Regions:
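N-terminal secretory signal peptides that target proteins for export/translocation
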Residues: 1-6
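A short helix->loop->beta-strand "cap" motif at the edges of active sites that frequently abuts
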Residues: 62, 175-179
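Active-site adenylate/phosphate-handling loop in enzymes that bind or generate adenylated species
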Residues: 127-171
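C-terminal accessory domains and tails appended to enzymatic cores
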Residues: 32, 164, 168-169, 174-176, ...
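Conserved acidic residues
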Residues: 102, 134, 178
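Active-site rim/loop-helix segments in enzyme catalytic domains that contact anionic ligands
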Residues: 26-131, 153, 161
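Bacterial N-terminal signal peptides
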Residues: 7-21
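Short acidic, glycine/proline-rich loop/turn micro-motifs
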Residues: 76-79, 191-195
Length: 302
């Protein structure tokens, strides 16, 4: 075969290969990327409340960012201040790597001193705008910890303002309003949590536990100390993660199962073990069921 013909055939085969590879990559990518911003009060709050959902979103190629409004510099019994804050930033970075999310930002506000001030509200507005969030998830404003309560309050205060051009004019306002959701909590007053969106996280429960494991200062030191269980923490790494799973990832409640039935078929509901729930806030855009399935594509796949 002449050399020019060989080169021609090689070029044809290479073009076919590249086209096939490109088409395969496009098939694996989400048809429309969803941008989700999770805002907690402390490094580790979001991991505990929504680590599984975040892992599922990231696994499907969607954009996920965690934010901690405080630096966590008070959450320990024998260390604190800048040394603890530095340690907790490193733990958050490692947790983000294990969950395979895009970013984990820890702000500078002191642990235990968060207030719903104009300064914090502006930071939250900026974060939502810069991330161009479709969904923003945060604490309910009725929680046991003052930082949780005020983190929830400041997200509420920012919910409308993110779309007002004259507020922080250097940060481009959102086009319309994102959907705002609440993390699940156990508090009943002034009103109980509503399981509007329930996500099965069985496929990524190991990844969630691994992310919690990254926060050593909290799950193996501070929180066991608070509950007088420090002597129960295993020394062995694998035993630690199993202990962590048993202690911090409870099986779903009847209320969660009832919420699950809206989004999953009977077999899936019966087989599900671990879930995460979210309540739709009255602030922000009010999504239809179809919109929720677009924002949480794992629900549309059922």
């Amino acid at each position: 075969m002449p050399a020019y013909a060989t080169r021609l055939l090689t070029g044809v085969f290479l073009s076919i290969f590249l086209f096939t590879f490109h088409a395969d990559v496009r098939a694996q990518a989400p048809s429309e990327s969803v941008r989700v911003l999770f805002i907690g009060a402390h490094p580790d709050d979001v991991d505990l409340k929504a680590g599984g959902t975040a892992a599922l979103l990231a696994k499907e190629g969607h954009a996920v960012k965690f934010v901690s409004l405080t630096n966590g510099d008070a959450g320990h019994y024998n260390m604190g201040g800048g040394i603890l804050a530095k340690r907790r930033r490193a733990e958050a970075k490692e947790a983000a790597r294990r969950l395979k999310i895009d970013e984990y930002e820890v702000l500078h506000y002191h642990d235990g001193e968060l207030m719903p001030t104009l300064e914090v509200r502006r930071d939250v507005i900026r974060l939502i705008r810069e991330w161009d969030a479709d969904v923003v998830v945060g604490h309910r404003p009725n929680d046991y910890h003052p930082d949780h309560r005020y983190a929830g309050r400041v997200v509420q205060d920012a919910a409308y303002m993110v779309q007002v051009p004259n507020v922080l004019p250097k940060a481009e306002p959102t086009e319309g309003n994102p959907v705002f959701l609440y993390f699940q909590d156990r508090f009943e007053k002034p009103y109980p949590f509503e399981h509007d969106i329930v996500v099965v996280i069985d496929d990524v429960i190991g990844r969630k536990v691994s992310a919690l494991d990254a926060h050593e200062s909290q799950f193996y030191e501070w929180l066991p100390w608070v509950s007088n269980a420090l002597d129960e923490v295993p020394e062995d790494d694998s035993a630690r993660q199993e202990w962590l799973r048993e202690r911090w990832t409870s099986l779903m409640s009847d209320a969660e199962r009832d919420g699950l039935e809206k989004w999953y078929n009977d077999r899936q509901v019966k087989e599900a073990r671990y879930t995460e729930s979210f309540q739709i806030a009255e602030y922000g855009r009010q999504p239809t069921d179809e919109e929720i399935q677009k924002l949480f594509p794992m629900l549309a796949d059922q």
